[in-house]
Amino acid sequence: MVKANENEYRLNFFLSRGYERKICRSCSTPFWTLDKSKENCSDVPCTDYYFFDIKIKSPPLTVRESREKFLRFFEKRGHTIVPPKPVVAKWRDDLYLTIASIVDFQPFVTSGLAKPPANPLVVSQPCIRLEDVDNVGITFGRHLTTFEMAAHHAFNYPDKQIYWKDETVAFAKEFFTEELGIPEDQLNFKESWWEGGGNAGPCFEVTVGGLELATLVFMQYEIRGQDYVPLKLKIVDTGYGVERIAWFTQRTPTAFHAIYGNLVSSFYKKIGVGEVNNELLKAAAIYAGRIDPDIKETITAHREHLAKQLGLDLKYVNEELTRAARVFQVLDHTKTIALMLADGLVPSNSGEGYLGRLLIRRALRVLRLLGSDVKLHELIKDQIDYWKEDFPQMLKNKDYIVDAVINEEEKYNDTISKIPSILSTLSKKSKVDLDELINIYDSNGISPDLILDEARKRNININVEIPHNFYSIVAKKHQNALVRENRKDKIPKEVIDEINNKKIEPTVPLYYKDQYLRTFNAKVLLNYKNFLVLDQTTFYPEGGGQIGDTGIIRSIEGNKQAKVIDTQKYKGVIVHILDKDSPFIQGEQVYGEIDWQRRYRIMKHHTVTHVILSATRRVLGEHAWQAGAEKTEYKGRLDVTHYKLPTEEEIRKIEDFANYIINDRRKVRPLYIERTEAEMKYGVSIYAGGIPEGSEIRLIEIENWDIEGCGGTHLINTGEIGGVKIVNVEKLQDGVIRLEYVAGDMVSNYARQQDEKLNEISKLLNSPVSQINVRLKKHLEEYENLQNLLDKYRKIVLDRIQEIAERISVNGITIYILRDFIDEQLIKEVMRKITSNNQNIVISIRGKDTKNVEIATSKDIKVDKIVDELRKIGGRGGGKGTYGSVSITVEEEKIIDTIRSAITNGV
């Protein structure tokens, strides 16, 4: 929908070259063309695809050739080629995946905070969009989950203009006519409007023969509520479809044939289904623009039209095109999965990992629908081999990609086993709505169509309507990251109000000038109860996983003093939290001293965290990205993304790497560097520990080992750490593992604790520490022998239990009474055996003063009433179905009489 004034689109370029502004007779959208007879905008659905018939001078171009032609064209015209960023948007805290080339420069470059890497520039950025995942294949190439957006960008500042609309449109005309040889009268510039990321502007969609080949956006407004405010920085934001250019020049039956070449036939064979006739596919593709996947009837109409035109049976057409669409989906999804994982995504139940798992499971589901037993990871290997020159990170991370997908395949199979229990729950409901379906998918990873398949097999009726775009709905719901709010809990609102009302200037952080500075003098700027703000300080405020400093602050005269028990920060203002109301007055000079021993230990744990993170990435793979961290006086904690628990050997390697770097006494230094320069020089891995703000960022460099953004305090040499010991590794959540470690003198402290535990075990085993393993092994062997012997005795008792157990009969029901049986396993086995036959109850009574009563009944007897009667005489507990447990302080005979009475009165 065009929102801009017509003058926004009335360019000198069009007027000088004789273009006419026309209105599409189908969609009523204005467009510019040299063809005076043209009546529509040459975009689907206003027309069918007819680009197959347009004569062009360009030879058929592969995806790689299309990309190179575009990049070199703009390089020759003064644009600097910049490398693409990963498809996992690690430099953004509000977005998981790279959905467009402009994302590379948001938010810092587009806001004017940071400089672009070049101006103007050109890039071919791989992108991933999952909001149309259900449409892939159905439209024969119009929808893809992964595509390359070839783009040239120009950033126009008030004092430095690069180029704007006329030049951008001229570049498009020149590229399409001279590089691809498209007749100029076939080009159409369709007026449109773009909005995204809080910005907006007019744009042109460049269409040829029904195919949109490019979009030319002119980002010139900021959206503020209902208003569009002109931006000082005006940005040329273009996007050319590399895959569409390849399809346009190759004129293959579908876009998938142009993108994947011989992989198409290979996938048909490996999946084990017949290849669909190319003539049928080409005919289907020509009319594919008529398909609106959100309207099921358009798919039906498309296939009916095709069957009629080609004189084919409709059932045959449906079967062939459905099979082709599914194979195309597998082709598309496997490439996207390989790209995601190659760029560091770890499949999980949250964040970007959720989107990765969603696509993996959708691919597995499609393979099931195709009746294929091929392994998904085998197909992904083929994608890696096919794209390894275009995306070398795929080959570099091949082992991780394949292993992670195998792991996901195993989890998916485990998930399938949960379907019957979920089906049982849903069958009892009158209707199952979309929210519940999404909740089931989020919680269990089970898609609704799998549930329906199982329901049909079992002849179970479930009242549910599954939207055709279920995966798209779920992906859209999870595509944006949840922006975490900065916690201000430790600074009360009253203090924040005081800071804002008095316009307190940011505190000078002396700890950056000298990280070893212990004492300082400062002036009091603000007092509020036990909260104190100074003009400068060496107290480090909590942030980046490093806890806040403690220490003392006293008056220069020494007659007033308070302990600092914590340090926090609000918008650059450092707040000292005291152990009592501040004794100081505003404007007073004070003396501060941090608890140096505590800070020094924290610095060791912070620096070693950087060492360990880099070691972890070297051992586990580059996908191991920091997901959280904490550095305290006593230990460090690092959470990293990884798909399974590391082996003991991997943990040893990480620890050995870290201690090698410590013993090698590597220099550690802070660097202050312009953000864009840092990204170009070191890559987005500088954001492994978080995304710092500002145009200039602070990096911590460990010589020839690690470099990442960090605002914490560090040692100047790794040798000062002394040593590190990993003390615990555990799975924190799906896709995230936690490492805990101690450094410096905390290593000896940990060793002392371990010695104490060993000595305690030594006493218990009555063995010297050096012989613990031998003695323990012997005890375990004896224990195993005793267990075997006990199992034999249990079997003897179990075989004769109905003969030897005390029992009474009430109303035809036999009650077996087990008094003071201490073997819990035997009790359970007795209960299971006896209650397998109807009209039986087993009661186990244990304990002296307080009796623990367990009741098991056969299926024909409900335990509830028995439990209710025991509650009436003071029992506490509950029961359901055929088992109950009650704690009670009455005599055994009273318990038995109560149960007898309950049965007499009918259970």
UniProtKB/Swiss-Prot annotation:
One of the record's GO cellular component terms: cytoplasm
Cofactor(s) named in the record: Zn(2+)
Disulphide bridges: none
Group of enzyme by EC: ligase
GO terms, biological process: alanyl-tRNA aminoacylation
Function: Catalyzes the attachment of alanine to tRNA(Ala) in a two-step reaction: alanine is first activated by ATP to form Ala-AMP and then transferred to the acceptor end of tRNA(Ala). Also edits incorrectly charged Ser-tRNA(Ala) and Gly-tRNA(Ala) via its editing domain.
Record's protein name: Alanine--tRNA ligase
Organism per entry: Sulfolobus acidocaldarius (strain ATCC 33909 / DSM 639 / JCM 8929 / NBRC 15157 / NCIMB 11770)
Primary gene name: alaS
